[in-house]
Amino acid sequence: MAGRAGSDERYVLDLCDEVFGIPAVRQERFDWLRGDPSPTRPRGTTLPVDGYWPDLGVVVEFQEEQHSTPVPFFDRRQTVSGVGRGEQRRRYDARKRVLVPEHGLRLVVIEKSAFTVSSRRIVRDRTRDIAVVRGCLETD
């Protein structure tokens, strides 16, 4: 797996920065967007969003395979919610789809499957990929 600097998420968010002309706040957390409670965190932990452009009121979530395809090794692990990681991920994605717009922000979800992928990584083609990103940002 690539480090965060070379990750597909970083690459796609960098393309979003280019389209918008300003950099995102990466891994921003909001007090109103929280995970499930646990014994040590009764209010739940704040959940990060991948990219946030405060001046534009836009949040971008980049969704890789694990958001739509089960990953048995990781998904079976129980979480503080008492459910597997895959189910928890689905719950948190749904929570973001509801709460982000409720708080006056526009949520754009960019699926990894929108890009050309080889060996589970985006095949970097800047011209093609920026067109994909631009299309997602303009239609969502």
Give residue spans per PLM region.
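Nucleic-acid endo/exonuclease domains
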Residues: M1-D140
